[in-house]
Amino acid sequence: MSALCWGRGAAGLKRALRPCGRPGLPGKEGTAGGVCGPRRSSSASPQEQDQDRRKDWGHVELLEVLQARVRQLQAESVSEVVVNRVDVARLPECGSGDGSLQPPRKVQMGAKDATPVPCGRWAKILEKDKRTQQMRMQRLKAKLQMPFQSGEFKALTRRLQVEPRLLSKQMAGCLEDCTRQAPESPWEEQLARLLQEAPGKLSLDVEQAPSGQHSQAQLSGQQQRLLAFFKCCLLTDQLPLAHHLLVVHHGQRQKRKLLTLDMYNAVMLGWARQGAFKELVYVLFMVKDAGLTPDLLSYAAALQCMGRQDQDAGTIERCLEQMSQEGLKLQALFTAVLLSEEDRATVLKAVHKVKPTFSLPPQLPPPVNTSKLLRDVYAKDGRVSYPKLHLPLKTLQCLFEKQLHMELASRVCVVSVEKPTLPSKEVKHARKTLKTLRDQWEKALCRALRETKNRLEREVYEGRFSLYPFLCLLDEREVVRMLLQVLQALPAQGESFTTLARELSARTFSRHVVQRQRVSGQVQALQNHYRKYLCLLASDAEVPEPCLPRQYWEELGAPEALREQPWPLPVQMELGKLLAEMLVQATQMPCSLDKPHRSSRLVPVLYHVYSFRNVQQIGILKPHPAYVQLLEKAAEPTLTFEAVDVPMLCPPLPWTSPHSGAFLLSPTKLMRTVEGATQHQELLETCPPTALHGALDALTQLGNCAWRVNGRVLDLVLQLFQAKGCPQLGVPAPPSEAPQPPEAHLPHSAAPARKAELRRELAHCQKVAREMHSLRAEALYRLSLAQHLRDRVFWLPHNMDFRGRTYPCPPHFNHLGSDVARALLEFAQGRPLGPHGLDWLKIHLVNLTGLKKREPLRKRLAFAEEVMDDILDSADQPLTGRKWWMGAEEPWQTLACCMEVANAVRASDPAAYVSHLPVHQDGSCNGLQHYAALGRDSVGAASVNLEPSDVPQDVYSGVAAQVEVFRRQDAQRGMRVAQVLEGFITRKVVKQTVMTVVYGVTRYGGRLQIEKRLRELSDFPQEFVWEASHYLVRQVFKSLQEMFSGTRAIQHWLTESARLISHMGSVVEWVTPLGVPVIQPYRLDSKVKQIGGGIQSITYTHNGDISRKPNTRKQKNGFPPNFIHSLDSSHMMLTALHCYRKGLTFVSVHDCYWTHAADVSVMNQVCREQFVRLHSEPILQDLSRFLVKRFCSEPQKILEASQLKETLQAVPKPGAFDLEQVKRSTYFFS
């Protein structure tokens, strides 16, 4: 094979096909020779060789199609190769003058020893080459400018392979005999024989591939990419390509090891849906040849194909008999295998030929959660008052259609709230220029996308994995519009190349899922069922029996959402990288935008630079400054958002499973996970359905809360936003207000200290400018969405993180945001204040000011009466009056409450006033409340208001007082730092550290927190900050140890347990009291993957790789706070479900619960009752038993597990605190 001196360009190809020692004649136009031109021998001058080499590299793309022929000649291991005729330049044969040469069927090994023949015709050839060079180059340029058609490629390359190459001689003989016989019966006989023959290992090097039952995380990156490729080919009608790649990989020993049963099954299922019996049998031959055992999905594919082809009953009967012999039950085909309704019907048709009386397993009644904690939630007896929405059925149906249309479009255009101005001549010109450029970019991107797809298709034909089917999922114009949308939203300072790649692949996947539901008929089925579902929620409709939304959706027999598995992380990163590079290479603009028609030179719109972040070199794509300036001049009036980033216009779908709920069509994860991690989703999938009912119903309830925008507050915020902001009130200023960098140009003789000072000043200005731009953009998105949703009703679908904590899905505008974001939101459905609602409004107002935290409720109410004039003045003249509201801790929420109080007190009947304002009730350091309850710690319970008291207990003030006692003692002993701290130990100094100790903050982190607080004190001697922060953090931890002894004991037990579990090579797992499985995803980042090539190599950590060792430090430090978070989420969910049963509106921000003013007393009662019920369970004992069973039962680790088992069983003993006291604690949540 050494005779094939292969190169990347035309020269290499022609040398490969030319006999040694004889020159070639000029080829005809349109042939390989015509494109490449005659080549000089190696005796040509270096300058001429350099020119040839440059031409070669320029022609690579067109000539790559001919490389397949040479690779084919080299691939002796592939026996059946069918090649279309490949036209090449006519070359003289050795010793012959006819000037023709047919490409050799097989290159002779002795060719390398051929003796060169002296050439006497070189002078004439060189002279002719000079005369025709210019003409040929002109023709070449014209040809290169023509789009490369896929039809041309298919005419030049080999056909797709269908028949497999089998390693087993016996099976290969059977296949050969089968292909020689009549085309009807042999395939049925072969199918029966294949299914009856037990698979066996063919040789030592043919290893059993991973079973289809194994998790995706256990597959290598190459296997994940291949499996995703096969599945994607099925979705894009590229089944022949998938079969071809499967045959190529199966025919090569090394590549065969990558194939798994799932891959064979995917291709089999595709052929089954087409009724292609012969091709299906080919795949089964390969399955048996690989030594694999067909599973339920394999049999389902075979039966489906026979059902479509109307096969005889004998073959079907033998297939069912073989299933039975292998222990596979017929009923499992319809219960354990995920098939579409059409596929199930076809399989059933085949089965009925043999067993006409067979019927599908009866649909069992929906299972009911029997958890003790949820027994009352699902009880049929007792009084139930599930709330209804305030909107009629017809209105809700119209809202549903709007939301459906929005998700089908995948994007939403929103008018920007930047200060509107009449477009000047300059602005109009900039917008016209921008439109012209975008039209050009759209054409260039379409052309680049087609060329890329053709190139990637060639790679598949050559038997290599490529992203070709993934690029075929969406219409070309849809992909281009998505790329241009990303380009428009790119910030001026640029975006990380990896982040951009990830975003592009995520958007592609989301659009694909929506489009697939559109073409599969899923949308029509959803419309029919959703209209019925709305009868449960509409104000003017009734249902036979009140029930929870999930239960009603299941009773309707609603269609199961398509289970579209997310693409593996390697595929996501490769696809995103490809699209990002395409965007960079295809978008160009004139170097002078002022005179674009006169400027012939084009420059890239995006350029690639490197920056250092945390000592890591990060690739960044930055827009050209001229393009940024053009965008600023154009001042386009709209912003474009993804549909999933905008609140919903109709009630979300109820969560019914880990993959079905929230948005109508757009894919949404039930559990947010680290990028690439799959363990959480697999845990949820294997979890019994009833175990998740509590979490699913709580998330549905939170998402069903209807919202509206507070228009008066929005007007005021917009007024400040458009008037250069007000950072003191949380309204960011525009970047133009950022401090200007120094303009001084220092001479070379300037002192190094002066240069360093200037560099620091410049870096500070740049940092501030970036932060201001980020804050301004965030506020712009939030306020633009609020303006867009003004006078509308909308909903916020929820999901949860791996600990069970809940979050709204739309990221830009929700109630988990800042003070401004919360003030802009209010309940769409109001409720009369009733006899006590106005009092709760006033108490809520005082709570927001932060002025009376340690006072009882009656004094807070009295304070509200004292400042009523300021309250009314703030409501009436917020920006021109006394501005009392601006001094509050939460100024904008305080202002919104002032307006609500003013409306209520001025109403003729305040009790009848319909209030929409959410009233908050906060836990008293909720993490410590859970710790005190777990340990039955009397001292700790009293500090965090678990124990009834006439006044609220403030744990932060208590810790500060205890630290002051220690400081006074040390000061008396003459300790200098203790003397300096006299008068500086306040609640504010220690609050953050006390609050975060419960969530695992270390002494180092606590010291930094205290240092920050001390630096904020202008009169504290700054030279003592470091020493004082060290001293205070020790005293804070010492105070907590004395005040919360039970808490520290539980923390230590959890930390030590996690440390030992990690040392055994496992990550920590547990199950929340509501049944949600939790697994900590912290593993060592040892396996960093790299995708090379292109403008930049990108690296990423494969978080889904469960073979990596646990990160012991993160596991042990994360277990205590994560466990407590799982408890506070369980408490919140129980409270939400019981409030829903009582007809209350309820939402939460973790440990801050919101409801109407009229219902605060009821919510507080439910909150206290559910906390007592939760902690009446033996939570730590249950955790201990679970961990012992999970990590101490493996026989091979019995010796290692002895210490772990001993630690796990040493549960800290509880104290004597009586939990029932919580029910009488007024300030438990207040």
Curated annotation (Swiss-Prot):
Residues 1-41 form a transit peptide. One of its GO terms (cellular component) is mitochondrial DNA-directed RNA polymerase complex. The keyword Magnesium does not apply. Residues 18-55, 95-115, 731-750 are annotated as: Disordered. Its EC number is 2.7.7.6. One of its GO terms (molecular function) is 3'-5'-RNA exonuclease activity. It holds the Pfam family RPOL_N. The keyword Zinc-finger does not apply. The active site is at D922, K991, D1151. Keywords: Disease variant, DNA-directed RNA polymerase, Mitochondrion, Nucleotidyltransferase, Primary mitochondrial disease, Transcription, Transferase, Transit peptide. Residues 802-1230 are annotated as: Mediates interaction with TEFM. Residues 732-744 have a biased composition (Pro residues). Its main location: mitochondrion. One of its GO terms (biological process) is transcription initiation at mitochondrial promoter. It catalyses: RNA(n) + a ribonucleoside 5'-triphosphate = RNA(n+1) + diphosphate. Homodimer. Component of the mitochondrial transcription initiation complex, composed at least of TFB2M, TFAM and POLRMT. In this complex TFAM recruits POLRMT to the promoter whereas TFB2M induces structural changes in POLRMT to enable promoter opening and trapping of the DNA non-template strand. Upon metabolic stress, forms a complex composed of FOXO3, SIRT3 and mitochondrial RNA polymerase POLRMT; the complex is recruited to mtDNA in a SIRT3-dependent manner. Also forms a complex composed of FOXO3, SIRT3, TFAM and POLRMT. DNA-dependent RNA polymerase catalyzes the transcription of mitochondrial DNA into RNA using the four ribonucleoside triphosphates as substrates. Component of the mitochondrial transcription initiation complex, composed at least of TFB2M, TFAM and POLRMT that is required for basal transcription of mitochondrial DNA. In this complex, TFAM recruits POLRMT to a specific promoter whereas TFB2M induces structural changes in POLRMT to enable promoter opening and trapping of the DNA non-template strand. Has DNA primase activity. Belongs to the phage and mitochondrial RNA polymerase family. PANTHER family: DNA-DIRECTED RNA POLYMERASE, MITOCHONDRIAL. This is DNA-directed RNA polymerase, mitochondrial.
